[in-house]
Amino acid sequence: MYIPSKALSEKKLPPEVLRPDKMFCIHYEDFGLGDAALYLGMYGLSRMGYIPLSAITRVFKRLGVTKGFFENGKIYGTLCYLVVCWDGKQKAYRFTHEENLDALLQAIREKTNIPVGKP
């Protein structure tokens, strides 16, 4: 069953472009990279929002560290985020596994001319 994605930017894709692009996008956890858009996980649902690749100005990875836990705070975990900049906005999306985020960033480098990494 196809559920159309919600456009997060001012630019929108027509339904005849959006549907096949979303159906055949490459999946990275709750995210997807198609030929025309980057699909983002929203509200616990996979690929429910999208940003056209023409609207994205920059993407990069942000890493964080959890508050210490187990044995008086001596063990820490890393948190990884995909940060997307578009239309003058910037939003971070959480990834569970860093290797999936690295694979998505590598695919963006290869398939598009969007700058990857901080300026």
What are these model-predicted stretches?
Residues 1-35:
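Anionic N-terminal interaction surfaces
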